[in-house]
Amino acid sequence: MDARLLEILVCPICKGPLHYDRAAQELICNADKLAYPIRDGIPVMLVDEARQTVEGTPVDPAGR
């Protein structure tokens, strides 16, 4: 995922920062506990496509 793109993308709900999970190919919003998929290198920033992250499991902002 392009670092410049990550700098401009925000959560469509809260407008907060997103963190890239390289292993899962998702962009994570820790505030809303949502994970947005990346398909064929393209972030799918639709709320209907997002999945809930596991409650209480913090996502590493460094993408590790």
UniProtKB/Swiss-Prot annotation:
Superkingdom: Bacteria
Assigned GO CC terms: cytosol
Pfam families assigned to the protein according to its UniProt record, in alphabetical order: Trm112p (PF03966)
Family per record: Belongs to the UPF0434 family.
Protein name (database record): UPF0434 protein Bcep18194_A5877
